[in-house]
């Protein structure tokens, strides 16, 4: 059976700047891929191509057996690909419940009765049910991050693209978020860009390293993080450091 996501020989450049240099990857449901690399490595550009924000110059993106390169960005959520951002973007004047309900209605395209039920289920799953009637703009940062995930889940996404979602949190909050993301693997495929290696290591089944738009490594987190090349280009440590 084909993988949920199949990216083949993806290429993108802006003049002399290469952001995707023949990138290929596959991802199945219930698998988390941690995506790391220095700033400018092409991580966000890869997400932008997966979500249709930018078009690749070449290569193929297949999702759930379908070539999605012609699917417009605003329709990718209906296909099943949703991105959660580093800086949460809730509708601040709406309640937490209304934010999630909106995602269920317009992201998933559910009818109102089903959307209402699904929104409550999602709030419970993400630990936000007790905040359902609170204005989203009044949430603390960790709960705004939870809401970002809740909206993605409510849209019935199959693939979650997490873009540095743990950024700005305390260590304790990071590990709370890790627990939630780990629980989401049971029903989703996840690609997670993050600069907190131990958080990724706690969730990811694989890690992929990008550098100047090229895939350098793809393998078990322990092997990738122990690589002398990764230690040098990503962590800024000498390749032979203990």
Language-model-detected regions and their locations in the chain:
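Glycine-rich phosphate-binding loops of nucleotide-dependent enzymes
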Residues: 2-242
């Amino acid at each position: 059976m084909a993988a949920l996501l199949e990216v083949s020989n993806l290429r993108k450049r802006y003049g002399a700047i290469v952001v995707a240099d023949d990138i290929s990857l596959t991802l199945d449901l219930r698998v988390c891929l941690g995506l790391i690399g220095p700033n400018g490595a092409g991580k966000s550009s890869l997400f932008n191509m997966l979500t249709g924000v930018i078009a690749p110059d070449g290569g193929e993106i297949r999702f759930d057996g379908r070539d999605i390169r012609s699917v417009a960005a605003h329709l990718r959520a209906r296909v099943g690909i949703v991105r959660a951002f580093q800086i949460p973007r809730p509708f601040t004047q709406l309640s937490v419940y209304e934010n999630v309900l909106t995602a269920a209605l317009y992201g998933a395209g559910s009818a109102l009765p089903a959307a209402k039920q699904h929104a409550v289920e999602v709030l419970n799953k993400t630990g936000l049910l007790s905040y359902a009637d609170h204005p989203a703009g009044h949430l603390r940062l960790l709960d705004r991050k939870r809401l970002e995930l809740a909206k993605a889940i409510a849209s019935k996404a199959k693939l979650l693209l997490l873009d540095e979602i743990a950024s700005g949190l305390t260590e304790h909050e990071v590990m709370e978020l890790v627990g939630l993301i780990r629980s989401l693997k049971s029903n989703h495929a996840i690609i997670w860009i993050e600069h907190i290696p131990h958080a990724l290591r706690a969730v990811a089944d694989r890690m992929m390293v990008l550098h100047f738009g090229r895939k350098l490594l793809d393998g078990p987190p322990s092997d990738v993080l122990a690589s002398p090349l990764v230690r040098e280009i990503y962590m800024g440590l000498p390749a032979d450091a203990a």
